UniProtKB/Swiss-Prot annotation:
Name of the protein described by the UniProt record: Gamma-glutamyl phosphate reductase
One Pfam family, short name: Aldedh
Spans through the membrane: none
Annotated Gene Ontology cellular component terms: cytoplasm
Subcellular compartments: Cytoplasm
SUPFAM superfamilies: ALDH-like
Example GO molecular function: NADP binding
Keywords carried by this UniProt record: Amino-acid biosynthesis, Cytoplasm, NADP, Oxidoreductase, Proline biosynthesis
PANTHER family noted in UniProt: DELTA-1-PYRROLINE-5-CARBOXYLATE SYNTHASE (PTHR11063:SF8), GLUTAMATE SEMIALDEHYDE DEHYDROGENASE (PTHR11063)
PROSITE patterns: PROA
Enzyme Commission numbers on file: 1.2.1.41
GO-annotated biological processes: L-proline biosynthetic process
UniProt pathway annotation: Amino-acid biosynthesis; L-proline biosynthesis; L-glutamate 5-semialdehyde from L-glutamate: step 2/2
This protein's encoding gene: proA
Length: 430
């Protein structure tokens, strides 16, 4: 028997509210698990229309959130993650369209075989149930998580950061409109309607067994708290201490293009490069141009002795720099002996998120891709492709850096599990 839910640091009213949210989400999950793909896609199509029609209201709400964040002294990287623009709202709508177009994972038979006794066994994809997503400053997570959970037949409880509270409500209203138009329960996508921090603790407790999995999207402290306190499984999205290794066989122009994009396209995303590793054999030709390019682009470079000698503007790196996710226009840079030394550095300082090699030699690239133990490894491509949309998933609920169940971008398919269906003709076990 499940113990009654209590708010250790919140009110009885909050505990009652969260209990009710969990109960309603569980009921909605049972409906969604049986909803036909056509009905879910009608909801997604209506959500796409609602996002476009509600763009002005979403942007107005976001402007208030951004103004409050600026007044609180938020840095530029935080503001970039929080800010919505007309282009970003349109990208949100386009992402919903892509999710609508992907194959419905629910009910897919991934494997089937017949036993000697004539029984047929099928492995079939089924929803997880109720997913709780706890996130911080990115308002677009409201849409991404909502539509991916819907597509995969899951109900979702969203707890956004207080900084993006207004933005999240405006986006959520569009998602609920889509559910309503398609005849699906509104509790299928639930937004926690309070900024009270105690709501997070209640979610981590599982809401009396109604939550099946928790996905944290945010900084290191949030993820650490979720992993420490959660009483249900967690898809951990850890910090992105991502590396770009420039090999001795790298084409310089390609390396410059990839490194600049990996670091500076958007510095506040989890796929941004945070450390540049350069092969010692390429230092004479590649080091100064790469470092100079970054500094000229407005990026602060913190380097070891060899990197400091390449450009007087480089600041000395400390031991802490190799373990830091800056999410800002700052990068650590180091000269390594070879690809083996680069792999060793990544194993010691990386976060198993995303790492890239720039190299023309296929054997060296294969070694890097095979030995670097990260969720995403790239050859001759920017780390900023660490994104569910770029994988063709339409969106992502996070980048899972663990090794159980989901790894890498978590899309609709990764939000399912499986069960076995067995068809017999009266067989009994001897």
């Amino acid at each position: 028997m499940t113990a009654s839910l209590k708010a250790n640091d919140g009110s009885a009213e909050l505990a009652a509210l969260m209990t009710d949210l969990g109960r309603r989400a569980r009921a909605a999950a049972r409906v969604l698990a049986l909803a036909p793909p056509e009905q879910k896609n009608r909801a997604l199509e209506a959500m796409e229309r609602a996002i476009r029609a509600g763009a002005a209201a979403i942007l107005d709400a976001n402007a208030e959130d951004v103004a409050d964040a600026k007044g609180s002294g938020a840095n530029s990287a935080f503001l970039d993650r929080l800010t919505l623009t007309p282009a970003r709202v349109e990208a949100m709508a386009e992402g919903i369209a892509v999710v609508r177009g992907i194959a419905d994972p629910v009910g897919a038979v991934t494997e089937s075989w017949q036993r000697p006794n004539g029984m047929t066994i099928e492995r079939v994809r089924v929803p997880l149930g109720v997913v709780a997503v706890i996130f911080e400053s990115r308002p677009n997570v409201t849409a991404d998580a909502g539509v991916l959970c819907l597509k995969s037949g899951n109900a979702v409880i969203l707890r956004g950061g207080s900084e993006s509270f207004r933005s999240g409500r405006a986006i959520h209203a569009c998602l609920v409109q889509g559910l309503r138009e398609a005849g699906l329960p509104e509790a299928a996508i639930t937004l926690v309607p309070t900024r009270e921090r105690a709501a997070v603790g209640l979610l981590l407790g599982g809401l009396n067994g109604t939550v099946d999995v928790i996905v944290p999207r945010g900084g290191k402290s949030l993820v650490a708290r979720v992993e420490s306190e959660a009483r249900v499984p967690v898809f951990a999205h850890l910090e992105g201490i991502n590396h770009v290794y420039v090999d001795r066989t790298a084409d310089l122009d390609m390396a410059k293009s990839i490194v600049l994009n990996a670091k500076m396209r958007r510095t506040g995303v989890c796929g941004a490069a945070e450390t540049l590793l350069i092969d010692r054999a390429a230092a004479d030709t590649h080091l100064a141009p790469l470092v100079g390019m970054l500094i000229d682009a407005g990026c602060e470079v913190r380097g070891d002795d060899a990197v400091q000698r390449a450009d007087a503007r480089v600041k000395p790196a400390t031991d802490q720099d190799w373990d830091t996710e800056y999410l800002d226009a700052v990068i650590a840079a180091k000269v390594v002996d070879d690809v083996d030394d680069a792999i060793t550095h990544i194993h010691e300082h990386g976060s198993h998120h995303t790492d890239a090699i720039v190299a023309e030699d296929a054997k060296t690239a294969a070694k890097f891709l095979g030995e670097v133990d990260s969720a995403i490894v790239l050859h001759n491509a920017s780390t900023q492709f660490a994104d569910g949309g770029e994988f063709g998933f339409g969106a992502e609920i996070g980048i899972a850096t663990g090794k159980f169940h989901a790894r890498g971008p978590v899309g609709a398919e990764q939000l399912t599990t499986f069960k076995y269906r067995i068809h017999g003709t009266g067989q009994t076990r001897p």
